Amino acid sequence: MPLLDYCLERGYELRFIELMRMGHLAKDSNAFLQQFVSLQQLLGLIGEHHEYLQANAPVDATAVRYEVPGKGFFGVIANESVPFCRTCSRLRLSSTGWLHGCLSSSNRHYVGDLLDKPRHQALPALQGLLMKALGDKQEVAFSGGATIMKIIGG
């Protein structure tokens, strides 16, 4: 808990993230399960050192937020334990110009070439690509994928 203590002492809101079934873990369930720490396990560990209460978060938040009374807040992005796909409003744009609508989908849409088009052509094309990317989102829960998080800027 040293990192959480460090953040609480300085007023930083730490985010923990559950391991996700991405990259090599998408197909290797044993490796995933050996490394996975669930939301409940994490809260159990934190509870040994701190009292905490669940705090409010926006409807489309990816993190479940908690308050350590008198000390600060922390959050857990727990997509395996508490899937948030249904309310996810995020899109990701890679540094190479690819738009990703969902971490669970290998679909991607290239927007880099729109930079060379005049505005009256680029905007409708961008709107179409945004709609396609939003259509890539999972309905209920993250299902994993071969995409590696570092490629899409998770």
Task: Identify the role of each PLM range.
Residues H50-S104:
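C-terminal accessory regions of radical SAM enzymes
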